[in-house]
Amino acid sequence: MVYKSMSAEFPADFTGGFVSILTQNTAVDNQVSFQYGTSFITGTTFSNIRLLDGYKCDYIGFGAGKRSLPTNTPSDLRVIPIQDAVDFTKKINGKWGINSFTAIPDQKFSFSLQHKFELENWKLSNISAVNYSTGYNAYNNMQNNRYQSYRDGASQYDNKYIDNVYKNTTKLGALFNWLLFSDKNKFEFRNFFNQRGTTALTQREGH
C-alpha cells in the first residue's frame, strides 16, 4: 500500500510517500508451486549487447562487493607520490574486458511453499518463497548533448555525444514467514529480503 499522508506510525523522515509491504503468513493449504515466465523487449531481445566480463556473483545481484575500493584508499590521489598512485590504481577492479553477445528474452522464476501444522491447542503455519529475474535493456543512438547559449539561431555545443547504453538487471527476492497461533494468542516471525544488481555499459562517440 502507498500512503501519501503522514500519520503517527510512520518514520519521522517521511517525505512524499510511504510504501507499506504486507506479506502473507497464514498458509491456506499445504502446497508447492513453481512458476516460470519470459518476456520480449522490442529493440533489445535478440539484438547485440555489450557488457563487461563481470563476476559470477553478478548473476544473483551481489557483484558490487567484488568492485569495492581496496583498504587504505587515499582520500586524494593528487597528494601522494605518482608511483604510489600508479600502484594503487592497479589494485582496483581489473575486469574491464567487454563481452559482445545476443540478448536472450527476460527470464523469471519463482518457487513457493506453504505448510500447516497441528500442535494440540496451537497451529503453526509457514510460507516460504524465492523469486529470481534477469533481463537486458539496450538504448541505441541516444543523443547526449550539452549546450551553450544560442547564436544566430543555431545551437552551440559544449559536448555532442551519441550513446549506446546496455544494461543487465538482476533481482533476487525471498520470503520466510512463520505464524504460531491459538484461540487467544498469536506469534509472528516475518522475513522479507530483496536484492537488485545492475551492470551497465555506455559506448559513447562524439566530442
What are these regions (language model features)?
Residues 1-34:
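A beta-strand signature from Gram-negative outer-membrane beta-barrel systems
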Residues 10-11, 42-45, 122, 136-139:
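Short helix/loop capping segments that flank catalytic or ligand/cofactor-binding pockets
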Residues 16-18, 49-53, 143-147, 204-206:
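Short secondary-structure boundary/capping segments
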Residues 26, 39-41, 196:
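Conserved nucleotide-binding/hydrolysis micro-motifs of P-loop NTPases
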Residues 36-41, 131-133:
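Short, solvent-exposed aromatic-acidic interface loops
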Residues 44-98, 102:
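Flexible glycine-rich, low-complexity coil/linker segments exposed to the extracellular/periplasmic environment
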Residues 54-65, 145-158, 207:
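Surface-exposed loop/turn segments flanking beta-strands in extracellular/periplasmic regions
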Residues 84-202:
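Transmembrane beta-barrel wall of Gram-negative outer-membrane proteins
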